[in-house]
């Protein structure tokens, strides 16, 4: 009989969002009349920007003409898209990022997991707690951890607690680690990182030969000009960081699938024989072997993000969700709840009322208000007693959900 990857058996029962779906579906079947509003999973609701739609329609027409037809594209992505990303997202902010260092993919979630293919099995890995579950689960799947304890913490990972006491920004560890996952604006807490804070992490990584895996999927929601959008705005980051970005939230590409990862040339890791090896070459080899690239049609849609029309439309889209976040913040605060995030991020992080666990509050919100959020404990042990509310929904649904919560007096 064929053997399996036993590391999958170490995963906690049910990925967070499928477990939420299971509970919601069970409630819906028992209460078919309930008008459930979903503010849980971070999926967008508003239509694709017109500029992106028009570009994809034209790309479909291209595929119907022999002279414009495209077959397999470059595994790294088309140069015309990578060049626009480099110029607009990085060089315009003073970041030394070349188009050749950008790899187009079908999602930053995929890249955050796939990047582990180029790293060894003996690295000391640091994650915040709470944390986006993908960072932890993909390391478990890859065999980088031991078993989970009663708190759901895996042996072999270094957990860095984030809480209201440290403004939801982890303290730099006193011990040496090799891989560091940072996500800003943060999922799930909505916290942001100052330039000084990121500089401290870069200094630590360079001093310890560590690599920062920087998830900037929500950078478009930053409105404070003092907050960096990229780790590469920080001096020295090219020597110690890889950055993940996505078109999912700023341009509504969750169902269209397009993202990118920046691996600086010159960034190095250590081989078993002690020699230093450039990570760009390893990632390029990995992508060329395991990935056939994002479709031409989708990449044309992503390229349109950088047109004048596209820029105006995605700014409008981001502003729409940020206004939702403002409404959620203000209404939950008025309801007597302790609220964080939701200013430079699309997520609001709420302290559960006294005596309620995260899942207790989930069930109460679902049953009493017919509103779905995400239990903080699903993001890690330190998330217990918190709850994430997403701003990704229609204005009508957000307003209705907040009215229900205020009327229920859940605080």
UniProtKB/Swiss-Prot annotation:
The alphabetized list of GO BP terms reads: lysine biosynthetic process via diaminopimelate, diaminopimelate-aminotransferase pathway
Q: Which domain of life is it from?
A: Bacteria
Catalysed reaction, written as an equation: (2S,6S)-2,6-diaminopimelate + 2-oxoglutarate = (S)-2,3,4,5-tetrahydrodipicolinate + L-glutamate + H2O + H(+)
For this chain, one GO molecular function annotation is: L,L-diaminopimelate aminotransferase activity
Signal peptide positions are: none
Pathway where this protein functions: Amino-acid biosynthesis; L-lysine biosynthesis via DAP pathway; LL-2,6-diaminopimelate from (S)-tetrahydrodipicolinate (aminotransferase route): step 1/1
What is its cofactor? pyridoxal 5'-phosphate
Q: Which residues bind substrate?
A: 15, 42, 109, 132, 187, 292, 388
Q: Enumerate the residues binding pyridoxal 5'-phosphate.
A: 72, 108-109, 132, 187, 218, 246-248, 257, 292
Give the EC number(s) listed in the UniProt record: 2.6.1.83
Q: Name one Pfam family in it.
A: Aminotran_1_2
Q: Which cysteines bridge via disulfide bonds? A: none
Keyword list, A-Z:
Aminotransferase, Pyridoxal phosphate, Transferase
Per UniProt, the enzyme's principal EC class comes to: transferase
| Modified sites of kind N6-(pyridoxal phosphate)lysine | 249
Q: Give the family, as the similarity comment puts it.
A: Belongs to the class-I pyridoxal-phosphate-dependent aminotransferase family. LL-diaminopimelate aminotransferase subfamily.
Provide the function of this protein: Involved in the synthesis of meso-diaminopimelate (m-DAP or DL-DAP), required for both lysine and peptidoglycan biosynthesis. Catalyzes the direct conversion of tetrahydrodipicolinate to LL-diaminopimelate.
**Record's subunit section:** Homodimer.
> Per its record, how is this protein called by name?
LL-diaminopimelate aminotransferase
């Amino acid at each position: 009989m064929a053997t399996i990857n036993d590391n999958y058996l170490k995963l906690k029962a049910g990925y967070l969002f499928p477990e939420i779906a299971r509970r919601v579906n069970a409630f819906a079947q028992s209460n078919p009349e309930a008008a459930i509003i979903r503010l849980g999973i971070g999926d967008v609701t508003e239509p694709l920007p017109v500029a992106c739609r028009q570009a994809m329609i034209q790309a479909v027409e291209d595929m119907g003409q022999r002279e414009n037809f495209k077959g397999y594209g470059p595994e790294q992505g088309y140069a015309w898209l990578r060049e626009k990303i480099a110029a607009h997202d990085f060089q315009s902010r003073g970041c030394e990022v070349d188009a050749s260092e950008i790899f187009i993919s079908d999602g930053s979630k995929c890249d955050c997991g796939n990047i582990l293919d180029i790293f060894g099995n003996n690295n000391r890995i640091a994650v915040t707690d709470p944390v986006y579950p993908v960072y932890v689960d993909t390391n478990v799947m890859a065999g980088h951890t031991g078993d989970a304890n009663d708190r759901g913490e895996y042996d072999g990972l270094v957990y860095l607690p984030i809480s209201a006491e440290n403004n939801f920004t982890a303290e730099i560890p006193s011990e040496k680690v090799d891989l560091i996952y940072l996500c800003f604006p943060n999922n799930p807490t909505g916290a942001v990182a100052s330039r000084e804070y990121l500089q401290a992490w870069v200094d630590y990584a360079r001093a310890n030969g560590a690599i920062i895996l920087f998830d900037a999927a929500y950078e478009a929601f930053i409105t404070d000009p003092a907050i960096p959008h990229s780790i590469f705005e920080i001096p020295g980051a090219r020597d110690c960081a890889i950055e993940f970005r996505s078109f999912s939230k700023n341009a509504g590409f969750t169902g269209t699938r397009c993202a990118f990862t920046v691996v600086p040339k010159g960034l190095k890791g250590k081989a078993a024989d002690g020699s230093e090896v450039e990570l760009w070459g390893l990632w390029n080899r990995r992508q060329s072997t395991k990935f056939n690239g994002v479709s031409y049609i989708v990449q044309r849609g992503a390229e349109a993000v950088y047109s004048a029309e596209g820029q105006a439309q995605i700014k409008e889209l981001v502003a729409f969700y940020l206004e939702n976040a403002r409404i959620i913040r203000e209404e939950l605060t008025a309801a007597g709840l302790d609220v964080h995030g939701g200013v430079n991020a699309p997520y609001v992080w709420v302290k559960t009322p006294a005596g309620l666990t995260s899942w207790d509050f989930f069930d109460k919100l679902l049953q009493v208000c017919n509103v779905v959020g995400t239990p903080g404990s699903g993001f890690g042990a330190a998330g217990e007693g918190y709850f994430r509310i997403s701003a990704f929904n229609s204005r009508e649904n957000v307003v209705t959900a907040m009215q229900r919560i205020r009327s229920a007096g859940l605080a």
